[in-house]
């Protein structure tokens, strides 16, 4: 039997500056539209019109409508990575104690998770599952970069960490904080509990829990 043709990529790479500008316009258009209504109620024509391009241009660039959700995902990842690299830079983190470092990381995470909430929920609900490996790979690369940087900063404050198993503690602390932030910001799971708490208070309490675990 002949081998099946490989699945086409989600887009054709934008090699020329004009193509890159077109993709940026489409990304902005999709971001605006997904804030207005669910992705399933958005057509390719809607995105093209908002971006100021022809429908044919979209289909020449992207495999199909759902492939455009990669734009939302890459926008989230790229924005978060830039923010983490800036706000957790050596210059900004110099001299900070463990609690201050943890607060800076958790505050940034909460802000970015809330900022991109609508777009990420649209991706989670509508992404083509045949592209699951692409999304997973993108997330893994991002986590390796950001979590790797954060672990390094935490290790530099080893004297403040009293947990007997440093590496296990670092990884579980990051996991606990990240999972709680995602659940609270994206799923809004705190609504199931009899508590009223704003983002600033949530950052404060999550920071306390993070530091307390590392010092247990």
Model regions and ranges:
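N-terminal intrinsically disordered/low-complexity leader segments
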Residues: 1-21, 91, 95, 190
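Generic hydrophobic, amphipathic alpha-helix propensity
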Residues: 18-30, 47, 72-80, 84
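Hydrophobic/aromatic residues within well-ordered alpha-helical segments
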Residues: 22, 72, 76, 80, ...
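Helix-turn-helix
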Residues: 25, 33-67, 71
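Hydrophobic alpha-helical connector segments
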Residues: 67, 71, 85-114, 170-173, ...
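Helical hydrophobic small-molecule/effector-binding pocket
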Residues: 78-86, 99-124, 178-185
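Short secondary-structure transition hinges
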Residues: 99-101, 114-148, 196
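Hydrophobic/aromatic-rich alpha-helical bundle segments in the mid-to-C-terminal region
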Residues: 121, 132, 136, 140, ...
């Amino acid at each position: 039997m002949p081998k099946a043709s490989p699945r086409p990529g989600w887009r054709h790479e934008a090699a020329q500056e004009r193509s890159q500008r077109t993709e940026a316009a489409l990304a902005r258009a999709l971001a605006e539209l997904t804030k207005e209504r669910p992705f399933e109620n958005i057509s390719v024509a809607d995105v093209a019109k908002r971006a100021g391009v022809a429908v044919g241009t979209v289909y020449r660039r992207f495999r199909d409508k759902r492939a455009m959700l990669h734009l939302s995902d890459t926008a989230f990842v790229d924005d978060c990575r830039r923010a983490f690299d800036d706000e957790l830079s050596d210059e900004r983190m110099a001299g900070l104690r463990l609690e201050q470092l943890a607060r800076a990381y958790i505050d940034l995470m909460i802000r970015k998770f809330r900022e991109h909430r609508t777009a990420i929920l649209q991706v989670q609900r509508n992404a083509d599952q045949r592209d699951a490996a692409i999304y997973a790979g993108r997330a893994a690369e991002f986590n390796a970069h950001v979590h790797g940087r954060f672990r390094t900063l935490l290790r530099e404050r080893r004297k403040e960490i009293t947990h007997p198993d440093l590496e296990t503690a670092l990884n579980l602390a990051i996991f606990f904080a990240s999972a709680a932030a995602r659940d609270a910001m994206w799923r809004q799971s705190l609504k199931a509990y009899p508590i009223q708490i704003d983002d600033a208070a949530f950052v404060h309490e999550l920071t306390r829990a993070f530091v307390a675990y590392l010092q247990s």
